[in-house]
Amino acid sequence: MGMGRVSFRPTNAEGIILMIRANLIDYMGSDLSIVNAARVSFGKRSSFGGRVGGPNVLKEEDEKLVHYLAKHKHMSPFGHCFASFHIKAPIYVARQLVKHKFLRWNEISRRYVSDPPEFHEPELWRSKATDKKQGSGPALEDQDVHIGTTQRLVAMLYESMLAKGVCEEQARMVLPQNTMTEWYWSGSLDAFADMCNLRTKNDTQWETRDLAFQIDAEMQNLYPIGWLALTRGIQ
């Protein structure tokens, strides 16, 4: 079922533009798709209904089947549900998430695009973790860290290089890790569940965790039974 493209200027309740954002743009299938993909092995087919809660609620035996499939890691039926997201995030976040090999990824390329760069600046600067080699600790007491001047200088340098005739694929080398990028990210229900199960853990980077929780919310809305079965309810 297609949903069409969504406006890509999302805001929070205060009207502030969210710099890191996952927008659902398309999806296919439902919880019933999981059930019927499994039951076809026996030449069977189910349908929605039969329980209180609305026309698109699984029958009790079908809900139990979905949880059984997830518990025993019978993943192929979950592969018949598919979603696509349009993601906007800084490069340093994107380079962590691209490692999930079963999700399809097509990203904007500054070999071809020379639009003025946008930069991500966190709301809070976090302290260095003291008990591990990676990660971060609580917010710094001294938040007097300013990168705006550097960002403006980098943007000016980038634009001047292009103006002098330097090709896009070389001019991009001066852009920092907090430059915003965007990509289409598509995959099956089980592939996104695997990503979210990993990226929502407490020891993951906050920025990637934030993005994973946004995807979690969309997938939970689309596939409430299947998503819960695969993620055990992300907290």
Residue ranges and their predicted role:
Residues 2-235:
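Family-specific signature for flavin-dependent thymidylate synthase
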